[in-house]
Amino acid sequence: MFLFDDILKGKIIIVGVGNTLRGDDGFGPALIEKLKKNFEEIGDRQYKSIPILIDAGNAPENYAGKIAKKKPDTILIVDAIDLGLKPGEYEIIKRTDMVETGFTTHNMSLSMFIEFLEKETGAEIYILGVQPKNVNLGEEISVSIQNTLDEISRLIFGQLF
């Protein structure tokens, strides 16, 4: 498993993927929102690197061209993915180590989106997959996922400071 200090290098784009109307599936967009608030609260302090934060919702393919034009060194895609773990547990997987899980609630297969970015940017691509508890329509993010959201936000923010 990778650590954030291993992967958050150079020009960074963090992409939150997920549907905020489906409980824990909204983890990716919720993390982006939390990170944006963290950076706004700190203001003009010096960071090692300020990432570009993109809430891609449930249509990451709509942002593929925009991401490619930014020519990042590192792309971290954050999504709720059924990894067979306990709810709230997560893994960071390098693109080259990724095995197609077959799980996505999005219009374009996550692996196709990632393949496009890999070809167009040459960036190191990582997937931060969080095990959801509940992805039912109309549900809120579960407590276990909220706790993970807080933890990951602190880890990312701390690494970039």
Regions found by a protein language model. Give the residues of each.
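N-terminal catalytic or cofactor-binding beta/alpha core of small enzyme domains
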Residues: 1-133, 139-151, 155-161
